[in-house]
């Protein structure tokens, strides 16, 4: 008999069995294996830095993902046609259960969504109404948060704020709007579609001939420059086509910070219009996941709360004679999700006729508006187009150029590139976008897809079986029970068939079954009542990236907090301090150099200067410089060194600053000083000020003006730090009204202004009301 894997053996052995019974089940095994738990593997994990940044053209990986979404559509001609579809009907024949499939069964999905609605209609209605009220009061500038966003007007990937500015400039020009709430922004998009004509500016690449002197010889050379081009659309059909083109455009990147994978994956970034729709969808589902009734969703929570839910949800299982726990892996998650299925789910939730048919109370009035917004979101998603981006670098002996994704350039492509390009070119349009009606792209609708999968848990449950699951997007863990072995098998097959009918494919190779209370979910490993987070993704030891002294201090203060909360013991604290300090040194390339400063004891050198760490588990709540000063206050050379480091007049030291924040204890705004006094090693970030073109200079000038305007606005109206205003009034007018009211209030309590002061106030009001062009929200 072959020996079984020891890890498998430890999962098969039950408590309460004799040694002989266990050996009959699994064969001979080492004595100690009975008590082996997850703690035995924790030391195998190494805390390392993330892999390097992804470089190269994203087009091959983007094409791979899009082609897979077509390939897994098992309808005739892969569901392509005038109206591409992913839903499977009875007339299409037997549903393909046995292969990876991107189709969802229409009638089965309807029944599952109805059963989910019957159980959760009250919480769905509560969250719908709360979300609608939030849309009316939330400022649309939430879209400025984020590193990269696709700017579809200029076909470039830029910081989110820059892409938002381009879209809002067009909206303001034609709709004369000043400020936007989220709801205003969505309405403005629809009003743009109705315009009879439109003129807008876009940036295009052009060639400019320049004179260049080299070695006394003047030559004419062509140089690539970016220039503004004015586009004039004179018909509503052209306006609609252009605006819809903007709203469906994506770009793709190669995913950096990837876990232990050899091959890179493509991720996508939407345009600001579609990002707004996706934000609304995600926020609703994140809020839904926070509700107590949604016991299976953990997408909205983290930390101790999430850990408790991972343990508590399986505990709600009705135990039977036969019980089992599955650690699941969904294969081809993004490629197989269908925008139509998302739309169907929300349509059923908010449909008056379906509610009436099921005998449920009517949805709130706001549900009709939410229903229309969600219909539009998934319509745009089903018409998405992904920009392939720059091509590979090609060169000969003297020149280099970038490949273009055109049929004419096939002669320059190697076999591997040619293979995928010939498959994708039928979906490629003249602007360089690939049409991708099926599936999702990585990073989209994580919370929405979590909710989409939940109806499968209870549908078609029979007496004598039970099922509980915890899910966060494509990661899930499920417990099953059955009164008989046959019922347990039927329960497992029922659940995975239900998921299959929703277009979710559970991998047979990667899904593992264990005894109850043993499994892995979102890198949290469960072993009985103990759940712990292991893995290279554990972020507690990663430097913050502010500057060396603050990052070192952060390592120590986080360790002190962990000790106080009981998260780590003193041994764990020592490890955490050592690894954390070492990681910060590595990030800033700080070498540990004993005897670096002549005459200064090595132990007095600060960490940022290559000195040793002063911390251990008993003193990590104290700042580094205070510890080193107390230790060396009798040594004049050490104290002189520390005084130089701490000298506030040092030209390289950032000025001390105060931060205005809201105190929950005092229920008011408070001024708080920075936790650590600034010193010589508090480096300042120097931003790249290179002006490559006049357009870049204009962008930078606009950014400086915005920062100055916001600084003035926050000084005049400190409450704006607490709540971002979302009204349609110009900032300048609001500031003028507040200044006038403040001056009037002060005079009413006996404060007298001199003539010079009154002149200054009148000048400020005149500037704000007449000379100001601060008209953004």
UniProtKB/Swiss-Prot annotation:
Question: What Gene Ontology molecular-function terms does this entry list?
Answer: nucleotide binding; RNA binding; RNA-directed RNA polymerase activity
Reply yes or no: does the keyword Zinc-finger apply: no
Q: Which Pfam families match?
A: Flu_PB1 (PF00602)
Q: What is its EC number?
A: 2.7.7.48
Q: Which PROSITE patterns match?
A: RDRP_SSRNA_NEG_SEG
- For the protein in the UniProt heading, the enzyme class is transferase
- Known function: RNA-dependent RNA polymerase which is responsible for replication and transcription of virus RNA segments. The transcription of viral mRNAs occurs by a unique mechanism called cap-snatching. 5' methylated caps of cellular mRNAs are cleaved after 10-13 nucleotides by PA. In turn, these short capped RNAs are used as primers by PB1 for transcription of viral mRNAs. During virus replication, PB1 initiates RNA synthesis and copy vRNA into complementary RNA (cRNA) which in turn serves as a template for the production of more vRNAs.
Q: Which family does it belong to?
A: Belongs to the influenza viruses polymerase PB1 family.
Q: Tell me, how does this one assemble?
A: RNA polymerase is composed of three subunits: PA, PB1 and PB2.
Q: What is this protein called?
A: RNA-directed RNA polymerase catalytic subunit
Classification from the root reads:
Viruses, Riboviria, Orthornavirae, Negarnaviricota, Polyploviricotina
């Amino acid at each position: 008999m072959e020996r079984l894997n020891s890890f498998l053996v430890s999962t098969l052995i039950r408590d309460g069995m004799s040694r002989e019974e266990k050996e009959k089940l699994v064969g001979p095994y080492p004595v100690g294996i009975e008590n082996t738990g997850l703690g035995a593997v924790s030391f195998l994990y190494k805390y390392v830095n993330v892999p390097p940044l992804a470089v190269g053209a994203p087009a091959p990986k983007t094409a791979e993902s899009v082609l897979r979404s077509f390939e897994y559509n098992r309808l005739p001609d892969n569901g392509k046609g005038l109206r591409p579809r992913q839903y499977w009907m009875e007339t299409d024949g037997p549903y393909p259960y046995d292969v990876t499939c991107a189709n969802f069964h229409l009638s089965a999905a309807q029944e599952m969504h109805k059963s989910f609605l019957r159980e959760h209609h009250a919480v769905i209605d509560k969250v719908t109404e709360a979300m609608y009220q939030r849309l009316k009061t939330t400022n649309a500038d939430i879209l400025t948060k984020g590193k990269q966003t696709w700017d579809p007007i200029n076909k470039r990937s830029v910081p989110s704020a820059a892409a938002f500015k381009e879209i809002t400039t067009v909206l303001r020009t034609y709709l004369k709007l000043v400020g936007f709430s989220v709801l205003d922004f969505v309405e403005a998009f629809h009003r743009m579609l109705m315009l009879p004509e439109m003129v807008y500016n876009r940036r295009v690449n052009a060639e400019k001939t320049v004179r260049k002197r080299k070695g006394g010889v003047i030559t004419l050379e062509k140089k690539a420059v970016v220039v503004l081009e004015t586009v004039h659309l004179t018909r509503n059909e052209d306006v609609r086509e252009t605006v819809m083109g903007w709203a469906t455009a994506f770009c793709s990147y190669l995913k950096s910070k990837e876990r232990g994978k050899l091959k890179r994956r493509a991720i996508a970034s939407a345009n600001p219009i579609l990002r707004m729709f996706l934000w609304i969808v995600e926020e609703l589902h994140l809020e839904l996941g926070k509700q107590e009734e949604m016991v299976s969703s953990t997408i909205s929570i983290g930390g101790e709360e999430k850990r408790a839910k991972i343990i508590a949800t399986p505990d709600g299982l009705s135990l039977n004679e036969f019980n089992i726990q599955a650690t699941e892996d969904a294969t081809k998650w993004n490629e197989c999700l269908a925008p139509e299925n998302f739309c169907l789910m929300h349509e059923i939730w908010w449909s008056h006729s379906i509610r009436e048919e099921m005998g449920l109370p009517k949805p709130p009035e706001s549900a009709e508006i939410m229903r229309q917004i969600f219909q539009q979101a998934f319509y745009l998603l089903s018409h998405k187009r992904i920009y392939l981006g720059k091509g590979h670098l090609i060169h000969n002996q003297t020149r280099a150029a970038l490949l273009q994704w055109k049929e004419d350039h096939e002669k320059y492509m190697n076999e591997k590139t040619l293979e995928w390009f010939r498959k994708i070119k039928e979906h490629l349009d003249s602007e360089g976008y690939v049409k991708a009606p099926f599936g999702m792209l990585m990073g989209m609708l994580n919370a929405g897809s979590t909710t989409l999968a939940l109806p499968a848990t209870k549908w078609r449950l029979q007496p004598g079986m039970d099922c509980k699951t915890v899910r966060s997007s494509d990661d899930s863990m499920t417990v099953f029970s059955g009164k008989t072995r046959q019922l347990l098998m039927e329960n497992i097959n029922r659940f995975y068939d239900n998921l299959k009918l929703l277009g979710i494919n559970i991998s047979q190779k990667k899904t593992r079954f264990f005894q109850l209370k043993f499994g892995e979910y979102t890198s949290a490993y469960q072993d009985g009542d103990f759940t712990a987070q292991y893995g290279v993704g554990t972020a507690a030891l990663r430097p913050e990236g502010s500057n060396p002294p603050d990052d070192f201090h952060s390592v120590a203060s986080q360790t002190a907090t962990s000790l106080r909360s009981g998260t780590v013991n003193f041994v764990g604290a020592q490890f955490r301090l050592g690894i954390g300090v070492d990681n910060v040194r590595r990030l800033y390339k700080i070498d540990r150099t004993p005897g670096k400063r002549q005459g200064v004891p090595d132990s007095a050198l600060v960490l940022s200067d290559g000195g040793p760490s002063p911390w251990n588990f008993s003193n990590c709540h104290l700042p580094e410089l205070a510890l080193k000063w107390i230790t060396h206050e009798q040594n004049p050379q050490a104290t002189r060194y520390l005084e130089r480091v701490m000298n506030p007049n040092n030209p390289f030291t950032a000025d001390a600053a105060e931060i205005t924040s809201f105190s929950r204890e005092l229920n008011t705004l408070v001024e708080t000083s920075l936790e650590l006094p600034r010193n010589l090693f508090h480096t300042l970030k120097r931003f790249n000020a290179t002006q490559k073109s006049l357009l870049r200079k204009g962008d930078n000038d606009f950014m400086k003006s915005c920062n100055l305007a916001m600084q003035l606005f926050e000084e005049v109206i400190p409450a704006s730090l607490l709540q971002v205003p979302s009204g349609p009034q110009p900032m300048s007018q609001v500031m003028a009204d507040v200044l006038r009211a403040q001056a009037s209030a002060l005079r009413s309590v006996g404060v007298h202004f001199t003539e010079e002061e009154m002149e200054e106030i009148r000048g400020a009001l005149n500037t704000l009301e007449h000379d100001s062009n601060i008209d953004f929200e």
